[in-house]
Curated annotation (Swiss-Prot):
Organism encoding this protein: Mus musculus (Mouse)
Transferase is among the record's keywords: yes
Domain HECT, residue spans: 435-774
Known EC number: 2.3.2.26
Coiled coil (UniProt feature): none
SMART domains named among the record's database cross-references: HECTc (SM00119)
Keywords: Phosphoprotein, Transferase, Ubl conjugation pathway
Function of the molecule: E3 ubiquitin-protein ligase which accepts ubiquitin from an E2 ubiquitin-conjugating enzyme in the form of a thioester and then directly transfers the ubiquitin to targeted substrates.
Active site: 742
Designated name of the protein: Probable E3 ubiquitin-protein ligase HECTD2
């Protein structure tokens, strides 16, 4: 199976299993029968605003198919809940009398939308060039005579064959490769860019031709010309208009039910689109899903019970686009462009439980396509799943206590940590080891010898102090790389890796308890953390091992990665000039040790022919093999807390955001959500403060956030989730601001001038670390 075909649903099992070609042949005729093309709002006189004429065309489509069923559909209520559906391949059968084997003609149009009859046009033997098309367009706009342009559109979109004749670079060539669709992309763009500005009769003719194409009989596997036709039609901007959604849905359905090999071709053709065109396809599909779920005018669509296949089909085509995007480096669009914020308003836990219960083989769930679910929605799923696990475990503890006729104790409902500040790491390790069965309970921390009830502040302080101590260079567990501004695992060998497990548990507890940590790991760390996303039942299975590239190494050790890239591009004799072998050296506790990258590596010279293998093995050694035991302990610690299928919904980048927060700052949002104690938001000192902060460069804004919260990143829920507070500090204005990071609180003296406030604030945030100046 190809890499592209496998990656249809990153972070989750494949959503739809493609049928084998042998099975497909027997099912083909039934699979391609189209459902009746009807719209619940196709009644005459339905007001669609400026798009009224296209709405009339939808009315024509309804008239041609089944008037009786359309009337029944209009009387049916529309439900937002998706009915049970197994998958795209198990779509409901279609009535035989709907299949029209004869082309629909202009005479079939109702009288109010008939267009003047045109002679049967035919495309010239030589395909039209962009210049030819633009000249025809200019003449039509100047003279008002659109006959030539109309003839081109009506013929080009008359069938899949004509589409290929019109848009292939060479009509006689096969172009049966994934690297080249064989289409004149400039002509496709020009034709579609002009389409919405042409007269309505031309636009109707194009839609009529698409219907004819989709209604044709298909026997046997698709040809590459058919795939090209689908690829062209997918780019049609008419499908932005809701009145065309019935036709668009049928197009998506046919693309979604193609076999895996055909999807493979489409994916590689899609990745060749321009960023603008690709983004338009994604946005069009997301809008289609959103409006089907929450239509502004429900009467414009068939009842949801009559088109249960619309959303699954669109989701599968979105999966093809997502796969194409992941194959391009850098991606055509950010992965966040696939998020559909509309899904934040559906019953996410119902979607999650459906996916948990039925997987990918029965009922449809958006969790089968996690790339469309926003990180905020995924956080809700993970939090609620965590809460349910916490409640379940706490309830079981209570039942066990009662069954033994022991008095229940409220403390049994929590993971209670009692630690000494002077022995923070060892005490924390001992407590977490002894209370391994309680890790999924709500965390509460007590510092020995100190009074105080943990309402969240002590827990956050425990995290901050522990992380700060473990990641200190003198502790030796992690190495800080200044060039990449991140930590990486020390490769030093030891007998006990329990402290690496502790760090993993800390990260898991942070996610589980919705706490943002000030940790800087490179992106490849989170990729390894999801390899695999669920702990394998076989304990001998390697964990934390993933495929790595020189780009991953660049995120950790940019200087070394640059040197290896220089080696790859070196034009001289590598063996004679570098005199290297497949052996590398590392310093451990002042002792230089050697490691062979492959058996007998110390005797294998690096040459021009094998240097790529050397770079790959060296990269794998640094990021996988040399730290395997350390990372395996870290992996097991994290998953001992976050053992949930919800992790399968996440990308590595999203795990990082859940652990560390987002780097995107919005200080205006922070201003809107800030609470005040002793000040009012209209006080002069507060107005000075925000004038200064909003005028800060990004670097100083990050320092302010780190000074007051312990991290320069923002929680998934945004600035509002920080619960930021500014309190009045009734001290001399000569004092610097003070921060209580455990409570995200800034104590501000009543400075009398903006200049004084700015000076004191910059000094305070620039010369503090972790907890501010107290």
């Amino acid at each position: 199976m190809s890499e592209a075909a496998r990656d249809l649903s990153p972070g989750a099992p494949p959503a739809v299993a493609a049928a084998a070609p042998e099975e497909r042949k027997g099912k083909e005729p039934e699979r391609e029968k189209l459902p009746p093309i009807v719209t619940a709002g196709a009644a005459a006189g339905l007001d669609r605003g400026s798009k009224g004429q296209i709405s009339t065309f939808s009315s024509f489509v309804s008239t041609v198919t089944q008037k009786k069923e359309a009337a029944e559909n209009r009387s049916s209520p529309t439900h937002l809940a998706l009915p049970n559906i197994r998958n795209v391949r198990d779509l409901p059968p279609i009535c035989l009398d709907v299949r029209q084997k004869q082309r629909m003609s202009v005479e079939a149009l109702p009288s109010e939308v008939k267009v003047p009859p045109l002679p049967e046009p035919s495309l010239p033997s030589q395909p039209k060039t962009v210049k030819d098309f633009e000249e025809d367009l200019e003449k039509a706009e100047a003279t008002g005579n659109w006959k030539t342009v109309h003839a081109f559109y009506i013929t080009a979109f008359d069938s899949f064959t004509e589409l290929n004749t019109a848009f292939k670079k060479d009509a006689t060539a096969s172009f049966n490769t994934i690297e080249d669709s064989g289409l004149n992309a400039n002509l496709v763009n020009a034709v579609f860019d002009a389409l919405l500005n042409t007269p309505q009769d031309i636009q109707k003719s194009v839609l009529k031709g698409i219907i004819n194409s989709l209604l044709q009989e298909w026997k046997g596997p698709r040809t590459k010309d058919d795939l090209r036709a689908y690829f062209i039609l997918l780019q049609n901007p008419q499908f932005n208009i809701t009145s065309t959604y019935v036709i668009y849905a049928h197009l998506l359905r046919q693309i979604a039910t193609l076999v895996e090999a055909d999807h493979h071709f489409l994916v590689h053709w899609l990745k060749k689109l321009s960023q603008k065109k690709f983004k338009q396809l994604v946005e069009r599909l997301l809008q289609f899903v959103s409006l089907r779920l929450f239509p502004a005018k429900p009467e414009e669509f068939p009842p949801l019970t009559k088109c249960t296949w619309w959303i699954p089909s669109a989701a599968k085509v979105l999966a093809l686009l997502n796969t194409a995007n992941n194959l391009v480096h850098p991606p055509l669009v950010p992965y966040t462009d696939f998020y559909n914020s509309t899904l934040d308003h559906i019953d996410l836990m119902e979607e999650y439980h459906t996916w948990q219960s039925f997987g990918n083989s029965h009922r449809f769930s958006f969790c089968q396509y996690p790339f469309v679910i926003s990180i905020a929605a995924k956080k809700i799923i993970i939090q609620r799943d965590s809460e349910q696990q916490m409640i379940s475990i706490a309830r079981q503890s209570l039942v066990d206590k009662v069954s033994r006729r022991q008095r229940p104790d409220m403390n049994m409902l929590f993971l209670n940590m009692k630690v000494r500040r002077t022995h923070l790491v060892s005490d924390s390790l001992d407590e977490l080891t002894r209370k391994r069965a309680d890790l999924k309970k709500k965390l509460k921390v007590t510092f020995v010898g100190e009074a105080g009830l943990d309402m969240g502040g002590l827990t956050k302080e425990w995290f901050l102090l522990l992380i700060r101590q473990i990641f200190h260079p003198d502790y030796g567990m992690f190495t800080y790389h200044k060039d990449s501004h991140c930590h990486w695992f020390s490769s030093f060998k030891c007998d006990n890796y329990s402290e690496f497990r502790l760090v993993g548990i800390l990260m898991g507890l942070a996610v589980y308890n919705s706490i943002t940590l000030d940790i800087r790991f490179p992106p490849c760390c989170y990729k390894k953390l999801l390899s695999p996303p669920v702990v394998p039942s076989d304990q001998s299975t390697p964990v934390g091992i993933c495929s790595v590239t020189i780009d991953d190494l660049c995120q950790v050790m940019p200087e070394l990665a640059h040197g290896l890239k220089e080696l790859l591009s070196y034009e001289g004799n590598v063996e004679e000039d570098f005199y290297s072998t497949f052996q590398v050296f590392q310093e451990e506790f002042g002792v230089i040790k050697s490691y062979n990258l492959k058996p007998g590596g110390d005797k294998i010279p690096v040459t021009n022919q094998n240097r790529r293998e050397y770079v790959q093995l060296y990269t794998d050694f640094l990021l996988n093999k040399s730290i395997y035991k350390q990372f395996a302990a870290f992996y097991c610690g994290f998953h001992s807390v976050c053992a949930s299928n919800a992790l399968m919904l996440l990308r590595p980048e999203e795990v990082e955001i859940l652990v560390c927060g987002s780097p995107e700052l919005d200080m205006h949002a922070l201003q809107r959500s800030t609470q005040y104690d002793g000040y009012a938001k209209t006080d002069l000192t507060i107005r000075y403060f925000w004038d200064v902060v909003l005028g800060f460069p990004l670097e100083l804004q990050k320092k302010l956030l780190h000074f007051t919260t312990g991290s320069d990143r923002v929680p998934v829920g945004g600035m509002a989730d920080l619960n930021f507070k500014i309190s009045k500090n009734e001290t001399s204005t000569n004092w610097l601001p003070v921060a209580h990071t455990c409570f995200n609180q800034l104590c501000l003296p009543p400075y009398k001038s903006k200049k004084d406030l700015k000076q004191k604030l910059i000094i305070g945030i620039s010369n503090s670390e972790g907890f501010g100046l107290e």
